Amino acid sequence: MSGKKSPYPDGRIPDRNPDGTPAVPWRSRWTEGVLPLWLVATAGGMAVLFVVGLFFYGSYTGVGSA
């Protein structure tokens, strides 16, 4: 993570510098810190769809199909 001292009591680092430029470079946003929530939700949603699809596939083939 960043070695900057946070001015906020809860430890947040400002998103922008005083001149308006991003405080953290774009590339660092993907390699440091927490994963973006949309990325976690997308991966989780795809996993849920896969498992549900596997159950539907299993209901039409194999032991429970006849």
Swiss-Prot record:
SUPFAM superfamilies reported in the protein's UniProt record: Photosystem II reaction center protein J, PsbJ
Keywords carried by this UniProt record: Membrane, Photosynthesis, Photosystem II, Reaction center, Thylakoid, Transmembrane, Transmembrane helix
Subunit structure: PSII is composed of 1 copy each of membrane proteins PsbA, PsbB, PsbC, PsbD, PsbE, PsbF, PsbH, PsbI, PsbJ, PsbK, PsbL, PsbM, PsbT, PsbX, PsbY, PsbZ, Psb30/Ycf12, peripheral proteins PsbO, CyanoQ (PsbQ), PsbU, PsbV and a large number of cofactors. It forms dimeric complexes.
Organism of this sequence: Synechococcus sp. (strain CC9605)
GO biological process: photosynthesis
Family, similarity comment: Belongs to the PsbJ family.
Gene3D superfamilies to which the protein is assigned, alphabetical: 6.10.250.2070
Listed transmembrane segments: 37-57
Name of the gene: psbJ
Gene Ontology, cellular component aspect: photosystem II reaction center; plasma membrane-derived thylakoid membrane
Compartment annotation: Cellular thylakoid membrane
The name this protein goes by in its record: Photosystem II reaction center protein J
NCBIfam families registered for this protein in UniProt: PRK02565.1
Superkingdom classification of source: Bacteria
Topology versus the membrane: Single-pass membrane protein
Role summary: One of the components of the core complex of photosystem II (PSII). PSII is a light-driven water:plastoquinone oxidoreductase that uses light energy to abstract electrons from H(2)O, generating O(2) and a proton gradient subsequently used for ATP formation. It consists of a core antenna complex that captures photons, and an electron transfer chain that converts photonic excitation into a charge separation.
Positions of region (Disordered): 1-25
